């Protein structure tokens, strides 16, 4: 089953994306480079728990 996750900006701006991932095939924490509109550049987004 796909679980909802939150991708939080590593720049410390507080910006985040929400997405889903299959925990069976990807058991580790997701890290991906995406655009942060607050910082106006690409930064690393890290997976956190969606409350």
From Swiss-Prot:
Region (Disordered): 1-21
Alphabetical GO biological process terms: translation
Keyword set includes Transit peptide: no
GO cellular component terms given for this protein: cytosolic large ribosomal subunit
Keywords: Ribonucleoprotein, Ribosomal protein
InterPro entries assigned: Ribosomal_bL33 (IPR001705), Ribosomal_bL33_CS (IPR018264), Ribosomal_bL33_sf (IPR038584), Ribosomal_zn-bd (IPR011332)
Any one GO MF annotation of this record: structural constituent of ribosome
SS bonds (residue pairs): none
Keyword Ribonucleoprotein belongs to the record: yes
Superkingdom of source: Bacteria
Transmembrane segments: none
Cited PANTHER family: 54S RIBOSOMAL PROTEIN L39, MITOCHONDRIAL, LARGE RIBOSOMAL SUBUNIT PROTEIN BL33M
Similarity field: Belongs to the bacterial ribosomal protein bL33 family.
Protein name: Large ribosomal subunit protein bL33
